[in-house]
Each structure stands twice: as structure tokens, then as C-alpha cells.
Amino acid sequence: MEISHSAAYAAAGVDITAGYKGVKLMSADVKRTHIPGVVSDIGGFGGLFAPDLTGMTEPVLVSGTDGVGTKLRLAELLNKHDTIGIDCVAMCVNDVICCGAKPLFFLDYIAIGKNVPEKVAAIVSGVAEGCVQAGCALIGGETAEHPGMMAADDYDLAGFTVGVVDKPKVIDSGRMAEGDVVLALPSSGFHSNGYSLVRKVFDVENADLGRYDDELGETLGEALLRPTVIYVKPVLRCIEAADVKGVSHITGGGFYENVPRCIPDGLCAKIDKAAIKTPAIFRLLQKKGGIDEHDMFNTFNMGVGMAVIVSPETADAALSALKAEGIDAYVCGEIVAGEEKVVLC
């Protein structure tokens, strides 16, 4: 008897029916991200979006793509997959907001060893939540089953976003000047960077991730899996309220690699390390791993997920705008003359 295509494919390790079930399970989560501009429904060959460009004189599209990295291993060890998608969205939208762009839509890509519909739907529920927090629509995605290439439980997650900003309103660091103020927007922890080192130091494969830690005030697993903060709405509100001259998403490479990306030649962001409010999880990692201070600031966000540089006259307005969106930002430095672009002292 001739084997049907789907049966033959299933025998090779790819379960098409699991894919169909996954789409059905995630449909409600996807639809709750839909905002004005969404034209297509889930399941089409392409995601359609008609942006409202009213009031823009020269709209510019801004794209960003990223993944979650080895933080995914924590999700697997804890068997908790419904928040990791927030990280995926955050890593993309927090990048495009650095030039002042509002994210419009998002697409995700999941590569997985074995397609378990409930697991995939949980991952996508996190992606949807991230999109809701960012105010963008989830208009498409792909789940690819990779038998023979990935272990059954393994998966990778990546995403792609497109935003828009009116060209005259693109954040221009060329206007930055001595005396401008550096604001720190608190992070929720490691966010989605440095997890290869984190996993090694904490020996997560053998650690009791569910044990309550008095120093942390929570379990180690909770501290390590906490989702990345999405700064889109707070930063957009800050841009409306203040004279924003630079925004830096503090990701891999920490302060030393990310702050200079928004600092023009001849100027330097002088950061007061004593002002930085660093969560206990960072100090615990530093102590346990014997990591020196410079390496910590050159690898992790150290409690600052985003740095926003504003004119001194509008610093209070910026802080108030961020506070109104639930972000307790604070001053952590100033712009001075210099060639190093960032100095921590």
C-alpha cells in the first residue's frame, strides 16, 4: 500500500498534524495582538499590514532582528515556556526604539526538535504578550521541526520587527552636548544576554533552580528566567515629553560596547558607578564566579536595561514621563568632553 505524504513525512520525524494543532492553539493569542493596520489573518503566505502614516512628512521604516540565545536552556530546565517569547520581542523592539521608531509588527521563528503543539503555543503566547506590551502586531511566524538536527526537547527562537519613524524625528546624537544628562532605565535582571556565562557560573544543569534563595528573595530559577523589560511605550512617551538626544539598549557587551554606539566623536558619557542600582543577582554571580568589576560592566547590563540621554533642562520632564509608564528611572551620569565615549568611575 502506498504511504501518504503526511504519513511518510511523520515517519521521517516531521508531524504536520502537530503543526496544524499548534496554529489552532495559538490563534487566540495571535489575534489579541492585532491593532489597526492588520490586514491579514493567521495562516496566510504573507503578513499584511497597512500603517497609518498620518502626520508624517517623510516616514522611514526601521527593522530589527534578534534571538533569545542560551536563556532558552533555562526555560527548558524549568519547563516554563510562556515568557521566553517576551524576551524575543524585547530584544528586537528595544533596538528599533533607540532611533525613535514605533514598532508596527513582529514575526517569530521557532526551530524545534519535535513539534509539541502545547509547547509551541506556550512559546507563542509569550511572543504575543511581548507584542501587546510593545503595541505592535504579531502578523506571522514559522515553526520548523528539525528531527535529526536537534534533540527532541531543544528549540531556538528568533524574531523580526519593523517600525516607523518620521525622518525629522529620528533621534540625532549629533545634537548631543556637554552637560546633557544620562538617565538609567532599570532592567529586570540579566535580560537576554550573558547566559552562557550565567549558566556556567551557576551550574544550572545541576543546581536546584526551585530552591528559595534568601539573598535573592526568590528562587534562582525565577531570577534567571524573568523576562526582559520592553521599553517601547516608556521611551516613546519620554521622547514626546523631553529633548532626547540618544538612546542605548544595554545588551551583550554591557556599558562599554553599547553606550558608545549613541555617543558622537569628541564626547564621553561619564557614568557614576555608585549611582547604578544593581540587583542582587548580579552581585551573586560576580562573587560566585570571581568576575572582576570591569568584566561585569563589559558583559551585563548591571541593572540598567536602557540609557537615555536628554538635555539638562528636560531631565525632570523625562523622568516624570518614564515614571508615568511605570519606569523608575534615575540620573546615572552626564556627557563630558572626551575621546573614550564612555567612562565608568
Question: At which residue positions do the language-model features occur?
Answer:
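Short, acidic (Asp/Glu-rich) active-site segment that either coordinates a divalent metal cofactor
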Residues: 156, 169-216, 220
